[in-house]
A protein has these predicted regions:
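Surface-exposed loop/interface segments of Gram-negative outer-membrane beta-barrel transport/assembly proteins
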Residues: 1-57, 73-188
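Long hydrophobic segments that form regular secondary structure
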Residues: 63-68
């Protein structure tokens, strides 16, 4: 979350000192009241959120009629996706103070990456014919092949002592956690 929820902004007391005597953001604008946080605390040095998403869809097909009544259609549907999300909540951010303001437990960064691809290849053969000009028949055969693959990784770090690291220095975090997953499935149908 980049800053307070909208209801926090709507119910905030409009009194207090937004800046201290040095011109810095005052985290607690109402003196002696730690329940109200300054809604202007997040800036580029103490909070970041970045997302990248790419999706590619491909759907080529071919349809051939080699003789009267016979058609063959072949279709390929493919999808490639990639997403990456980076987040950083550092010393001095709104969420840092909201969580308690402890550098060892309330500063964190996360990188999440998801990649997947899948495709489906379908072949459809159809034959139309008449018998004695009064009966019309249609025969259809279908085959399908599909393949799905996904891998996900997530890296998190808690206890980041310096805001300059953002998510790029997770090895410097006091507590690190990494996880990954992979799944694949294939199928054929007639």
């Amino acid at each position: 979350k980049p800053f307070a929820k909208i209801q926090d902004g709507m119910t905030a007391i409009p009194y207090g000192e937004i800046y201290d005597e040095n011109g810095n953001i005052n985290p607690y604008p109402i003196e002696g009241d730690a329940n109200y946080l300054n809604l202007l605390m997040n800036n580029k040095s103490n909070w970041r959120n970045q997302s990248q998403n790419t999706k590619l869809y491909v759907n080529p097909y071919i349809k051939i009629t080699p003789i009267k009544g016979l058609t063959w259609e072949s279709r390929v549907n493919g999808t490639l996706t990639y997403s990456r999300s980076n987040s950083f909540q550092g010393d001095g951010s709104y969420n840092f103070y909201k969580a308690g303001g402890n550098v060892e437990t309330d500063t964190n960064a996360k990188i999440t990456q998801n990649r997947s691809y899948n495709y489906k290849w379908e072949n459809i053969v159809t034959y139309n014919f008449n018998i004695a000009k009064i009966h019309e028949f249609t025969l259809t055969g279908v085959s399908t092949w599909n393949h799905n693959q996904t891998d996900n990784t997530e890296m998190t770090g808690t206890g980041i002592a310096n805001n300059k690291y953002l998510w790029e220095g997770l090895e410097k975090a006091a507590v690190q956690k990494n996880s990954s997953s992979y799944s694949m499935s294939k199928g054929v149908g007639l």
